[in-house]
Amino acid sequence: MENSDSNDKGSGDQSAAQRRSQMDRLDREEAFYQFVNNLSEEDYRLMRDNNLLGTPGESTEEELLRRLQQIKEGPPPQNSDENRGGDSSDDVSNGDSIIDWLNSVRQTGNTTRSGQRGNQSWRAVSRTNPNSGDFRFSLEINVNRNNGSQNSENENEPSARRSSGENVENNSQRQVENPRSESTSARPSRSERNSTEALTEVPPTRGQRRARSRSPDHRRTRARAERSRSPLHPMSEIPRRSHHSISSQTFEHPLVNETEGSSRTRHHVTLRQQISGPELLSRGLFAASGTRNASQGAGSSDTAASGESTGSGQRPPTIVLDLQVRRVRPGEYRQRDSIASRTRSRSQTPNNTVTYESERGGFRRTFSRSERAGVRTYVSTIRIPIRRILNTGLSETTSVAIQTMLRQIMTGFGELSYFMYSDSDSEPTGSVSNRNMERAESRSGRGGSGGGSSSGSSSSSSSSSSSSSSSSSSSSPSSSSGGESSETSSDLFEGSNEGSSSSGSSGARREGRHRAPVTFDESGSLPFLSLAQFFLLNEDDDDQPRGLTKEQIDNLAMRSFGENDALKTCSVCITEYTEGNKLRKLPCSHEYHVHCIDRWLSENSTCPICRRAVLASGNRESVV
């Protein structure tokens, strides 16, 4: 009897708590509608465009007011740790959802997340430049496939530190040479700081000329790099392969500067401080910093060709993404760094270099596969122009633009995976077991990055896989003197400081390629890859706008609900209108809460009730 009484009391308390929770939510919903009703049209658009309204009942009126005041005062200053380029444990959020992070991009435009799951670690960085409108998305993935992953990591990190001791002279000199940091640069992870700097004789940008002229130590470093460079890539090849102009992309840039480097210059400084080497490409090509664009208007021909010299406000903003994966057979490259091992790794000939390009609706994709010393590197680069951008910044980074971008990312993942799997079937060397093992490993060893001014990254553990932030330029098309499209996939893999580079030579350009459906192994993959099935949509839909622009939405009629109006309910939130509610009226005469229908129309172009097109097709504009 006592047990039944206690159970009844417990259930009564639970139901009372549920009722209180429901009442609190209803109160918050009422406060939300009242808050929106009292907003001026300017304040409403400000909060809507920055996705600060949220869902009715989700936030209190005080929270909404705080968001409004915060957005009016301007974005908060960037983390001081970020300006220093150091790692911070505050960024580590293992449980955070990547989807939540991507949604936050639309609010802040500058976010960093990192985490770890098992033997996999990831780091994602988003940067928006309000001056140029450029959006840079960088995803780096490190995978340690050794059975003793923890031991291997602990074993290699001291090795990396010891090796970097050889380069104190070089790194400290580069830090002195490059005191100015880029305000929008991503903070590097450990593997980025340990990546290989490539130093070759290519025409430098303005920043690189300045860096080289300041320090004889830097020239000595470059000389050491040249002495240890593989005989397969003599310096005489560099001028012939370093430049090529692609008319459809209107830029030219050197690509081989990252493909070859010295094991003694493997550890370089943070992304912001590095000017020589891989960042040459970033500066000359994609220009993530608007202030830097203005200051370098008189830069090199690379800069002029990319449209920087015309001013960041005049050239179309661009999203650049890089998706990379390195496949390494477990058990290889575990020996300690030595002259003999470096010589062996550099004496093996790159083979099976393949390049493939496709362009659809302005989205240019480039794929490359190359192999050297048993390390096979696959690179997929996507260049996405944003055609509709306001001067205030990346205003089109709504859920529509984000989803379009992510569809391109995931399509790139799919094509890259297909490229890898189909290539594995025709692998000329290695046993069947090795091929099967590589095919299985490739599912968890892919990484993507989008670049503006970042540097190539390589892993510091013996069998890890990482993405390259600067490879947005590294895998873009280059060419030989014959003018054919070609590509250099300039990854440098280091196994316990054993460097091996992979470079693509020339490949024929082909339009279109049949792709088999790609499946993703979710069991051991990173959270980011769980987005694949959601965003990997039909490519036929890439060119179709999925919603209305803010200007198109604002042109729709809006009114306030009056006391004499017939009682109606918003079909989006299923809430009755009250006096003073702001309603938006569609051409089909259906009305909705302004905040409800605006969110709907940002991702859809039809009325939620009758499914009629809100705008005639002739009046639609592409939102991407």
Curated annotation (Swiss-Prot):
Tissue distribution of the protein: Expressed in many tissues.
Ranges in a coiled coil: none
The organism's place on the tree of life at top rank: Eukaryota
TM region(s), chain numbering: none
EC numbers, comma separated: 2.3.2.27
Location in or out of the cell: Nucleus
Molecular-function annotations in GO: transcription corepressor activity; ubiquitin protein ligase activity; ubiquitin-protein transferase activity; zinc ion binding
Pathway named in the protein's UniProt entry: Protein modification; protein ubiquitination
Span of the annotated motif PDZ-binding: 621-624
Main subcellular localisation: nucleus
Compositionally skewed regions (Gly residues) per UniProt: 445-454
Annotated Gene Ontology cellular component terms: cytosol; nucleoplasm; nucleus; transcription repressor complex
Catalyzed reaction equations: S-ubiquitinyl-[E2 ubiquitin-conjugating enzyme]-L-cysteine + [acceptor protein]-L-lysine = [E2 ubiquitin-conjugating enzyme]-L-cysteine + N(6)-ubiquitinyl-[acceptor protein]-L-lysine
Any one Pfam family match given in the protein's UniProt record, by short name: zf-RING_2
InterPro entries in alphabetical order: RING_finger_E3_ligase (IPR051834), Znf_RING (IPR001841), Znf_RING/FYVE/PHD (IPR013083)
Composition bias, Low complexity: 142-153, 455-507
Transcription regulation is among the record's keywords: yes
Extent of Basic and acidic residues compositional bias: 1-11, 214-229, 329-339
Zn finger residue spans: RING-type: 570-611
Miscellaneous comment as given in the Swiss-Prot or TrEMBL entry: Acts as a positive coregulator of ESR1-mediated transcription in breast cancer cells.
Assigned protein family: Belongs to the RNF12 family.
Quaternary organization: Interacts with LIM/homeobox factors such as LHX3. Interacts with LDB1, LDB2 and SIN3A. Interacts with LIMK1. Interacts (via N-terminus) with TERF1. Interacts (via C-terminus) with ESR1.
Disease: Tonne-Kalscheuer syndrome: An X-linked recessive disorder characterized by global developmental delay apparent from early infancy, impaired intellectual development, speech delay, behavioral abnormalities, abnormal gait, dysmorphic facial features, limb anomalies, and urogenital abnormalities with hypogenitalism. A subset of more severely affected males develop congenital diaphragmatic hernia in utero, which may result in perinatal or premature death. Carrier females may have very mild skeletal or hormonal abnormalities.
Function: E3 ubiquitin-protein ligase. Acts as a negative coregulator for LIM homeodomain transcription factors by mediating the ubiquitination and subsequent degradation of LIM cofactors LDB1 and LDB2 and by mediating the recruitment the SIN3a/histone deacetylase corepressor complex. Ubiquitination and degradation of LIM cofactors LDB1 and LDB2 allows DNA-bound LIM homeodomain transcription factors to interact with other protein partners such as RLIM. Plays a role in telomere length-mediated growth suppression by mediating the ubiquitination and degradation of TERF1.
Name of this protein: E3 ubiquitin-protein ligase RLIM
UniProt gene name: RLIM
